[in-house]
A protein has these predicted regions:
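A solvent-exposed interaction/effector surface
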Residues: 2-180
Length: 180
């Protein structure tokens, strides 16, 4: 949707699809950080995504149970009156061994409310409209036992990694939602 800014029209990223998908129980393996930041670079430099893929038996192991698996994940937890949590890692099959130096979070079989955000790489990370679009589908955001809401950026190959002929990519942004 075009926006007017200083008399000039600017095209920003847009949400092109919102949908519900079912996922099996999975284990997130990664590291926790105090906020968004330059942490992604160390993941690539240290080969940590490769290590997690090897630990789960290759990316095919997750793709067998979730067609949108094998993405690099920026996992977020928000709850009123509690500190924001940010984790980087990958979702793996349940019970995947956790490499030394990493943490894990087990998620039950559940559903996701997913938005596809289409645009330039530096534009697609504005996820502010996704929550309302997910709830507009009649989906209820799932909360953990401490009242926290979980969501994540799912950076999938090739949707996220290979720009189209316009130089745009698609970022999957997902909320854990109740399986109604």
């Amino acid at each position: 949707m075009p926006l007017q800014s200083g008399g000039m029209e600017t095209i920003m990223a847009e949400i092109i699809k919102t949908f519900k998908e079912e996922i099996p129980a999975m284990r997130f393996i990664g590291k926790k950080y105090p906020n968004f930041g330059p942490w992604w670079g160390e993941w690539f430099a240290n080969g940590w995504f490769d290590l997690i893929e090897e630990t789960m038996g290759g990316s095919d192991a997750i793709l067998k149970i979730w067609k949108n698996g094998a993405g690099y994940i920026g996992l977020e937890r928000r709850s009123e009156g509690q500190p924001f949590e940010y984790h980087i890692g990958m979702l793996t099959p349940a019970n995947t061994p956790v490499p030394e130096g990493f943490e894990f979070i087990d998620f039950p079989a559940i559903a996701l409310g997913t938005c596809w955000i289409y645009g330039k790489e530096n534009e697609v990370h504005n996820t502010s409209k996704c929550r309302s679009l997910v709830t507009d589908l009649g989906l209820e955001i799932w909360k953990d036992d401490k009242d926290g809401e979980w969501s994540f950026e799912n950076c999938l190959c090739p949707r996220y990694t290979t720009p189209d002929d316009k130089g745009n990519i698609i970022l999957d942004y997902c909320y854990f939602v109740k399986n109604i």
